Amino acid sequence: MTQLYGGIEAGGTKFVCAVGTGPDDLRAEVRFPTTTPQETIRRALEFFRDQQDRLGGGIRAIGIASFGPVDPNPASPTFGHITSTPKPGWQNVDLAGEIRRGLNLPVGFDTDVNGAALAEGLWGAARGLDTFIYLTVGTGIGGGGMVGGRRLHGLLHPEMGHIRIPHDRQADPFAGICPYHGDCLEGLASGPAIAARWGAPPEDLPPDHPAWALEAHYLALALANFICTLSPQRIILGGGVMRQSHLFPRIRAEVPRLLNGYIQARPILDEEEMQAYIVPPVLGARAGVLGAIALARHAANAPDSPIL
């Protein structure tokens, strides 16, 4: 019998649940809105129980790639909990524990962005690399990745969307929308920040709108910081805002300008190599749930070892 794995991409607006082994083998998939914890978790459990019945019990483990903040430390008493999220009703929910107890299966758990990064490392834009980052720019801004073949963990998990970047209030008097920090990266450059600043959602703004030069500048400032601190071999930019493909050439031009020759690496210095350095995700919208399946594979097979 083929060993199968369950994945849950737990998003703030929707859950995606799937069963399979990887991008070329997804046996079943379902999507439903994220409502209350009780209803949402119940629907996830029903999906996997139904698949277990159909497959004769072939699911070995479940992986969860969740919105956050979360506690991803297996040694912590609150491992698998969603912690200080602003989403009403979801604070301190033991998501991993509810799934583990409901299905009696091992559970792997991490942030949604670390999950997407993991999937891109195994099957997508960062395949073959051991140090890279994945930044998603959409309703919020979040980041994850791998350093030396290990997911970025430590005190908690990366909160790349909440770094502080230079904000010239004369050029951009917008105060920012982050309820915690105001004008952090997410407060200035997320999709809702663009809409609040310009009075229209990003998808309604034409490519020549001044919003995009400012957006590229803010994202390039963040990437310059990440390049200097993490030295990634590749940077993957996903999320709804990055569907504006004209942002990529703007960002690729702005990052070397900001670094000003200090980082002597060909992907930074060579315009052609830069095209392969700052890239969109290969797996697209499937990266999150595929990352969850990868977390499940790891939980079932080698929970105490590096994941790549």
What are these regions (language model features)?
Residues 9, 63-67, 134-140, 144:
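Short beta-strand segments
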Residues 76-92:
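A charged helix-plus-loop insertion that forms the helical arch/lid used to bind
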Residues 107-111, 115:
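General beta-strand structural signal in soluble alpha/beta enzymes
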Residues 116-122, 143-145, 164:
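Adenylate-forming
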Residues 157-171:
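A short, polar/charged loop-to-alpha-helix boundary motif
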